[in-house]
């Protein structure tokens, strides 16, 4: 996933890190990226990687809102035999971009269950709990300490969500 903030681009990857060197069809060996990559776009013709935040193995999704980067679905990894492995780290990670956009730092997070996608409105973060078939709402007014507000169940394959402009309706899409 890719998001921008100011003159910087943030790149997350869901590449399997069980084997960091992957042989491509071309016969070339590629080193898979780590964590969240930060690219300086001040001069787009000569964009350059300036930092790699290595606080996660991988991320399914990233979202920028109000100077913070939200890393979602992190540290889930699939082994070569298809078994899911988890490092038990944060399922929601909040990085401060405002203080130093070229070198974000973790300020908060939440561990509980895998989140597949999120949307944010008025300091409320709505997360899709795809495996628990739910939508989870968090108060993120204190980025250092997000608080679980509620969890709505019965939403099969909760894949993506979005809140209406007026904040009165939450839309959810299923992955099936």
Regions inferred by a protein language model and the residue ranges of each:
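Feature marking well-ordered beta-strand scaffolds used for ligand recognition
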Residues: 1-176
């Amino acid at each position: 996933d890719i998001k921008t903030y100011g003159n910087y681009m943030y790149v997350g990857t869901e590449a399997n890190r069980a084997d960091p060197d992957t042989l491509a069809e071309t016969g070339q060996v590629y080193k898979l990226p780590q964590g969240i990559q930060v690219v300086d776009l001040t001069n787009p013709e000569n964009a350059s990687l300036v930092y790699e935040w290595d606080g996660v193995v991988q991320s399914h999704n990233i979202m920028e809102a109000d100077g913070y980067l939200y890393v979602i679905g992190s540290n889930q990894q699939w082994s070569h035999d298809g078994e899911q492995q988890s490092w038990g780290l944060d399922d929601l990670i909040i990085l401060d971009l405002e203080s130093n956009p070229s070198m974000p730092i973790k300020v908060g997070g939440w561990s509980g269950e895998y989140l597949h996608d999120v949307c944010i409105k008025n300091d409320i973060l709505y997360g899709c709990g795809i495996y628990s078939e739910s939508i989870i709402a968090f108060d993120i007014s204190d980025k250092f300490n997000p608080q679980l507000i509620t969890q709505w169940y019965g939403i099969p394959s909760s894949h993506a969500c979005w809140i209406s402009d007026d904040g009165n309706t939450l839309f959810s899409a299923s992955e099936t």
